[in-house]
Amino acid sequence: MLPAESRMRRRADFAVAVRRGSRAGRRLLTGHLLVRGDDGDQPPRVGFVVSKAVGKAVVRNKVRRRLRSIVRGYLPSLPGGSLLVVRAHPQAATARQADLAAELDLVMSTLVRRQVGALR
């Protein structure tokens, strides 16, 4: 479980991250990261989008739990005030935990590299 202050809940936060943040996609996942320099004292916040295309409720919740456990390890490395949205593709329903972790690692490295470059 992610800490309460690290969870993204408001629709407006999701919209801002998706519209203004950097995007990186792979076969199983797409990530959107927005680093906001003005909110450095706030913790990074993470939200998950797992649509009905992924599967029924049990499958969607399973994918969301897996992603949450993987993303928890990235929280300390994210800049303060950043917004991260992780969107699962339908293939994520049948993927192994290791495959999800590997793809998320690639997505995160791409996103962080793009955002750090944009801040310079």
Question: What does each model-found stretch correspond to?
Answer:
Residues 1-120:
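Positively charged, solvent-exposed patches that mediate nucleic-acid binding
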